Swiss-Prot record:
Keyword Nucleotide-binding: no
SUPFAM superfamilies on file: F-box domain, RNI-like
The protein, known as: F-box/LRR-repeat protein 6
Gene: FBXL6
Function in brief: Substrate-recognition component of the SCF (SKP1-CUL1-F-box protein)-type E3 ubiquitin ligase complex.
PANTHER family reported for this sequence: F-BOX/TPR REPEAT PROTEIN POF3, F-BOX_LRR-REPEAT PROTEIN 6
UniProt domain F-box: residue ranges: 10-162
The LRR repeat ranges on this chain: 177-203, 204-229, 230-255, 281-307, 312-337, 341-365, 368-393, 394-419, 423-449, 453-481, 482-507
Quaternary structure, from the entry: Directly interacts with SKP1 and CUL1.
BP-aspect Gene Ontology terms: proteolysis; SCF-dependent proteasomal ubiquitin-dependent protein catabolic process
Keywords per UniProt: Leucine-rich repeat, Repeat, Ubl conjugation pathway
CDD domains, A to Z: F-box_FBXL6
Organism of provenance: Homo sapiens (Human)
């Protein structure tokens, strides 16, 4: 029986304290005990916080988990062991007990509970700003009580998108799902959305009015409302919202079925503070534009009218001069994929005041439009601060008409034609007028589909090689798809524009095979330059 006893003694002797690991040494080196600092470690960061009551070192926390439970004291604990084992144990010397670190009093709540609430809210705010409040805040609220308290702060719920669950479901099931979601919103609105600023409703069909009523009661700070694919929006709901939310200044009604009377009533109530308005063109758009022409929204800065899925064959008649008088503060005007006609000014009528604050004009269209040099002059004759001009699909615009514009600091010019016109009627020369005027400020230039000759394009793009002051040109995006640009011209542009990050050479008949594609990024653009310098010229 001596062998088991000696084996037991050896086992106990091996229970000596382990040497400290390198991780524990660094842990104590970064935040020594008594220094007033403690470390908080997560999966991807290490925080050093100054706070009274430093955290326990890792070794002590691990030891507290490994400490065995003490046997209960009582009569049963004092029972005598077996006689054989007792005599053998008495013969062998008793080993010294292994020193175990004594853990500090109080449970280890974890690093997440030790972060101050205001810091945790700021961390959550960075994630919300990047990805939105959902689903992150909902998941974070389940981690612990401190995280739930931080995720419940109304300041984090400033931007919310509510999508109806009826997509892909039958109509009856969709109504039930909307009612169920509405019941949840009755609690969320007063408890989470009291500081809501931006709200988006997507594909709501039957419960739009109750939701807007809740918003008016619980969200006084609302500034932006978007209704996308929604039905049943009434005038009472919009007017009530305009009265309850005194800071509401932006309304997006694109792709929603809203009566023109409802929109006009809303603009009459909140028009004095309206800044941005998005609409989808329909037969009722004329009535809404009539309210804008009557100076209903004198502070309007952004106006966008686009075409819905079901294209309207009736062109929109837009009185340009009346719009300039009704919206003198307009900064962005977008008529996207819209067939519209400028209303004739009439004989003897003085030109309008223009848009002195206009910075962006977008008239892009994939269909036939009636935008000419004369119409463009009526729109932009008083806009010296224009930065973006998008005329894609406007085949009637010529370089001569663009040369007369008063803007001198244009940064983006899009003149691409995508198979919407006859190449025989396109201008063959005049592109140097554009680049010579704006070569010092242009960052994006789109000439795709234009019919300029090889020599004309060479002269136009050569303007970027001799910018005033000897500085590098600002050009970073160049679209030459379907043009007659030559390899030597492309090589010169790449060499003279070191900041070029996008170059589209698709369907360029004068370039060698294998190079007719789009290049994205500095490496691909430089690779294109190397290939052009080493490839033989096409026959």
């Amino acid at each position: 029986m001596a062998a088991p006893a000696s084996r037991q003694v050896r086992r106990r002797a091996r229970a000596a304290p382990r040497p400290r690991s390198a991780e524990d040494w660094w842990w104590d080196r970064l935040a020594p005990r008594g220094s007033g600092y403690h470390l908080l470690q997560s999966d991807s960061m290490l925080l050093v916080l100054s706070e009274p009551g430093p955290a326990r070192p890792r070794a002590q926390r691990r030891a507290s988990r490994r400490t065995p439970r003490q046997p209960p004291r009582g009569p049963s604990a004092a029972a005598k062991p077996k006689a054989g084992l007792r005599s053998e144990a008495a013969a062998a010397p008793a080993p010294a007990p292994a020193p175990t670190p004594t853990p500090e009093e109080g449970p280890d709540a974890g690093w997440g509970d030790r972060i101050p609430l205001e810091i945790l809210v700021q961390i959550f705010g960075l994630l919300v700003a990047a990805d939105g409040p959902m689903p992150f805040l909902g998941r974070a609220a389940r981690v612990c009580r401190r995280w739930q308290e931080a995720a419940s702060q109304p300041a984090l719920w400033h931007t919310v998108t509510l999508s109806s669950p009826l997509v892909g479901r039958p109509a009856k099931g969709g109504v039930k799902a909307e009612k169920k979601l509405l019941a949840s919103l009755e609690w969320l609105m007063p408890n989470r959305f009291s500081q809501l600023q931006r709200l988006t409703l997507i594909h709501w069909k039957s419960q739009v009015h109750p939701v807007l009523k809740l918003v008016g009661e619980c969200c006084p700070r609302l500034t932006f409302l978007k209704l996308s694919g929604c039905h049943g929006v009434t005038a009472d709901a919009l007017v009530m919202l305009a009265k309850a939310c005194c800071q509401l200044h932006s309304l997006d009604l694109q792709h929603s079925m809203v009566e023109s009377t409802a929109v006009v009533s809303f603009l009459e109530e909140a028009g004095s503070r309206m800044r941005k308005l998005w609409l989808t063109y329909s037969s009722q758009t004329t009535a809404i534009l009539g309210a804008l022409l009557g100076s209903c929204c004198p502070q309007l800065q952004v106006l966008e009218v686009s075409t819905g899925i079901n294209r309207n064959s009736i062109p929109l008649q837009l009185p340009v001069e009346a719009l300039q008088k009704g919206c003198p503060q307009l900064q962005v005007l977008r008529l996207l994929n819209l067939m519209w006609l400028p209303k004739p000014p009439g004989r003897g009528v003085a030109p309008g005041p223009g848009f002195p604050s206009l910075e962006e004009l977008c008239l892009a269209s994939s269909t036939c439009n009636f935008v000419s040099n004369e119409v463009l002059g009526r729109l932009l004759h008083g806009s010296p601060n224009l930065r973006l001009l998008d005329l894609r699909g406007c085949a009637r615009i010529t370089p001569a008409g663009l040369q007369d514009l008063p803007c001198r600091e244009l940064e983006q010019l899009h003149l691409g034609l995508y198979g919407t016109s006859d190449r025989l009627t396109l201008a063959k020369e005049g592109s140097p007028f554009l680049t010579q005027k704006w070569c010092h400020t242009l960052r994006e230039l789109d000439l795709s589909g234009q019919g300029f000759s090889e020599k004309d394009l060479e002269q136009a793009l050569a303007a970027f090689l001799s910018t005033p002051g000897g500085s590098h040109p600002a050009l970073c995006s160049l679209n030459l798809r379907g043009t007659r640009v030559t390899p030597s011209t492309v090589s010169s542009v790449i060499s003279g524009c070191p900041g070029l990050l996008y170059l589209n050479l698709e369907s360029c008949r004068c370039l060698p095979r294998g190079l007719k594609r789009a290049y994205r990024g500095l490496e691909e653009v430089q690779w294109c330059l190397e290939q052009l310098l080493t490839s033989p010229s096409p026959s």
